[in-house]
């Protein structure tokens, strides 16, 4: 069970890293966008870890949640990672001419 959960997390993490690298490549000529993307991604990792801590707030999680705790953390982390990957992929196709959609500028 834990091996499968870990494998699913690894796959989602690889997909996230791939989407991130694709953005870095696609927008390499937009240094301000790249700079802010890197900041946002570092903050997202902190946010993800804080959400996990909030989801399982115990100081002794293995005692309070039992042996299933590592599985639960991996499942939650996978869910958050998949969501973030979707968010990053949305930046691959900005709607041209829609200023409110944001996006890299010269």
Task: Locate predicted features.
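N-terminal alpha-helical modules
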Residues: 1-106
